[in-house]
Design a protein with these regions (language model features):
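Loop-to-transmembrane helix entry/capping segments in MFS-fold secondary transporters
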Residues: 54, 83-94
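Transmembrane alpha-helices of Major Facilitator/SLC transporters
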Residues: 1-15, 28-36
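Intracellular juxtamembrane helix-capping segments at the cytosolic ends
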Residues: 65, 69-83
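Symmetry-related core transmembrane helices of the 12-TM Major Facilitator Superfamily/SLC fold
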Residues: 119-141
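Glycine-rich segments within core transmembrane alpha-helices of 12-TM secondary carriers
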Residues: 1, 92-106
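Hydrophobic core of transmembrane alpha-helices in multi-pass small-molecule transporters
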Residues: 48-70
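A gly/Pro-rich, aromatic-decorated transmembrane alpha-helix motif that marks the paired
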Residues: 40, 100-113, 127, 138
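C-terminal ends and interior cores of transmembrane alpha-helices
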Residues: 27-49
Length: 151
């Protein structure tokens, strides 16, 4: 909730200069990936068998929330704008089902996490997420063209 007024102010201040919806998605994925890489650092610096400051977790949450603010509200908005009027409710359902599917995939991936694999787990998940964000950045012009001017 802390970030909502900040982003509302930022988008208002930027006006027409703000990034497109697809770029916001790519930046959101990048932030999510960076939050995983951030969580890798304490294990690399101090080892996985010691307690570290909660600062690491708070900072990771802060980074991933920035990503969430760039994906979730934008995704909801774009879904309603792109959906045909008679199918808006169904498309919103598909948006939420895609989130559920992602959580189901994550439930399988998280099984690879142990204290022995902690650093590698966060590094691999963060790295893959960042690769997907880079791929999305490359596709932004094509996506914007397909969106036919919908911001």
């Amino acid at each position: 909730m802390i970030y909502v007024p900040i982003f509302a102010w930022l988008w208002g201040k930027m006006g027409k200069k703000q990034p497109s919806s697809s770029k916001k998605f790519a930046y959101g994925l990048l932030a999510a990936g960076l939050s995983f890489l951030w969580m890798m650092l304490p294990g690399m610096l101090f080892g996985t068998d010691v307690k570290v400051s909660p600062f690491w977790l708070i900072m990771s949450w802060s980074i991933v929330i920035v990503g969430e603010m760039l994906i979730s509200p934008i995704g909801l908005s774009v879904t309603t704008k792109l959906a045909p009027k008679s199918f808006q409710a169904q498309m919103m359902s598909i948006w939420f089902l895609s989130n559920a599917a992602a959580q189901a995939i994550n439930a399988q991936i998280v099984k690879f996490y142990t204290s022995e694999t902690e650093v590698a787990y966060y590094g691999i998940v963060g790295g893959i997420t960042i690769v997907f964000s880079i791929i999305l950045f490359f596709y932004v012009p094509r996506i914007e063209k397909l969106m036919s001017g919908i911001k």
